Structure formats: structure tokens, C-alpha cells
């Protein structure tokens, strides 16, 4: 109905033969609604991640505010991320955006941390957790969010 709000988020990490596929379809069919999709993946050792997301704004769904972002952090050259973000808009008074990025750890950020004495593994962990933070921050239950951060830290530690 009118004035509805939906936030959907996901964060995942993958190793080796891991294949993770997210498919999200959000339909706006009422006035003054908001949707937010935030999906983050960290992949290593040949893992594969896929994101397929769509925001559909039907005629008459004026004042819609739709946001969709899908990002991956590839920790090696063997991993891959495939994305298909979509917007389908049939109303003229909307604010919708979507995007997808995929890349390695920022070399300048790594250099900055290393130049301040942070060991390479710890710097990688810190930058990886910072990358995932936007999705984890969408979780309102802080106890659950803290548990997820602990699991992510455990996953990062297994590489050493």
C-alpha cells in the first residue's frame, strides 16, 4: 500500500567451489514507497557470486524512491562476480538508482594501513569487514549483526 518501506540486504563470503546466487525482485505499485537493496559478496579461491535484481515501478506509483546496489570484493584473480541490475519504470515522478561494482582491495587503502604498521593480513581483514559493513549495518538486531561480524572474522582467519 501507500507509504510502504522495504529494505533488503545480504552479505556473503565464498571460497573455492562456492557458488552463491541472489535474485531479488521488488515491485512498486503504490504511491510514496521506498525500497533499498544492498548486497555485498567477498569471494576468494575461485568462488563465484551472482546478483540478479530488479526494481519495477508500475504506472501510478508516483513518488517512488528505489535504490539497488550490488558489489563484490574479489580477493584473487580466480574468483568471479556476475551481475544483472535492472530498473523498469512506468511512472514519471520517481527517484530510482541502481548499480553494480566488482574489484579488488583498494591498493591505496592497503598502502595507508601498511605504512602505519598494520600487517598485511590484518589490513586485508579490516578492509574486507569495512566493505561488508554497509550490508551488515542494515540489520536492526545488533546481537545478530555482531554474530555475523564474528562469523565473517572467523572466515577471514581461516585463510591464514
What are these regions (language model features)?
Residues 1-118, 132, 139-160:
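Conserved beta-strand/loop scaffold segments within soluble protein domains that form the structured core
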Amino acid at each position: 500500500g501507500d507509504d510502504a518501506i522495504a529494505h533488503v540486504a545480504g552479505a556473503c563470503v565464498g571460497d573455492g567451489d562456492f557458488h552463491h546466487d541472489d535474485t531479488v525482485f521488488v515491485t512498486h505499485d503504490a504511491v510514496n514507497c521506498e525500497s533499498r537493496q544492498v548486497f555485498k559478496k567477498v569471494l576468494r579461491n575461485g568462488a563465484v557470486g551472482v546478483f540478479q535484481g530488479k526494481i519495477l515501478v508500475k504506472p501510478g506509483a508516483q513518488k517512488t524512491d528505489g535504490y539497488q546496489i550490488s558489489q563484490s570484493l574479489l580477493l584473487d584473480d580466480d574468483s568471479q562476480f556476475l551481475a544483472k541490475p535492472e530498473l523498469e519504470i512506468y511512472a514519471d515522478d520517481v527517484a530510482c538508482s541502481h548499480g553494480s561494482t566488482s574489484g579488488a582491495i583498494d591498493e591505496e587503502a592497503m598502502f595507508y594501513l601498511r605504512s602505519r604498521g598494520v600487517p598485511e593480513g590484518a589490513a586485508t581483514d579490516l578492509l574486507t569487514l569495512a566493505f561488508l559493513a554497509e550490508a551488515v549495518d542494515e540489520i536492526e538486531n545488533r546481537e545478530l549483526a555482531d554474530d555475523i561480524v564474528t562469523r565473517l572474522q572467523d572466515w577471514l582467519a581461516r585463510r591464514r
